């Protein structure tokens, strides 16, 4: 009988495959949409720029005045390039066009670089949140209340003109261009994420450890496609693949 393979151990969600999340600072998100943001703006100040383990982009701790006296509203935002401690951040319909401010995308001119864009009104930011990412406003349709934006992938998407976005590019760009240089850095990088590293290839294992293992030289020896309803210990390689082989031709992006 074969051993339990790596894919089965991942599904068990043991400590080896679980992300080390106890050091994380929190979920970065916009303020909950309220009357003040819909009709005017609210003013906050950046208290500190912090590192969040497992995330490439730095975070900014922003403090707004609370709804009641002597109470502060502390928020965690994804920091754009150029944001600094002591900077004032304005969020709302009548905020100025400055890096770090949060406005409805319908109020921003075409060609504006934005990040942390709401996909749906009130979801507090869902698109263009990774380090160095940004989206671009392509056009507005005031009749339908829709704005067309260009996503980091290059594709275009229509979102509500009332959806909010932060002006600027997410900080930390070029992070992946810096080489690791040693295995220890890769170890610590993957340790805080839910990834297993280093990953041993199946053909390098013994036949008792993996369906691709064994042989007088490293080769699979059979087709790597598997059925959707195969048992867990057999589902490796290309699972329920519609097609195999190289992708030929160019990808057409609809305007």
Curated annotation (Swiss-Prot):
GO molecular function: RNA binding; structural constituent of ribosome
Domain of life: Eukaryota
Keyword Transmembrane helix: no
SMART domains named in the record: Ribosomal_L2, Ribosomal_L2_C
Swiss-Prot/TrEMBL GO biological process terms: cytoplasmic translation
Matches recorded under Pfam families: Ribosomal_L2, Ribosomal_L2_C
UniProt-listed InterPro entries: NA-bd_OB-fold (IPR012340), Rib_uL2_dom2 (IPR014722), Ribosomal_uL2 (IPR002171), Ribosomal_uL2_arc_euk (IPR023672), Ribosomal_uL2_C (IPR022669), Ribosomal_uL2_CS (IPR022671), Ribosomal_uL2_dom3 (IPR014726), Ribosomal_uL2_RNA-bd_dom (IPR022666)
Disulfide pairings: none
Keywords, alphabetical: Ribonucleoprotein, Ribosomal protein
Region annotation (Disordered) ranges: 211-235
GO cellular component: cytosolic large ribosomal subunit; extracellular matrix
SUPFAM superfamilies on file: Nucleic acid-binding proteins, Translation proteins SH3-like domain
Family: Belongs to the universal ribosomal protein uL2 family.
Protein's recorded name: Large ribosomal subunit protein uL2
Taxonomy of the source species: Eukaryota, Amoebozoa, Evosea, Eumycetozoa, Dictyostelia
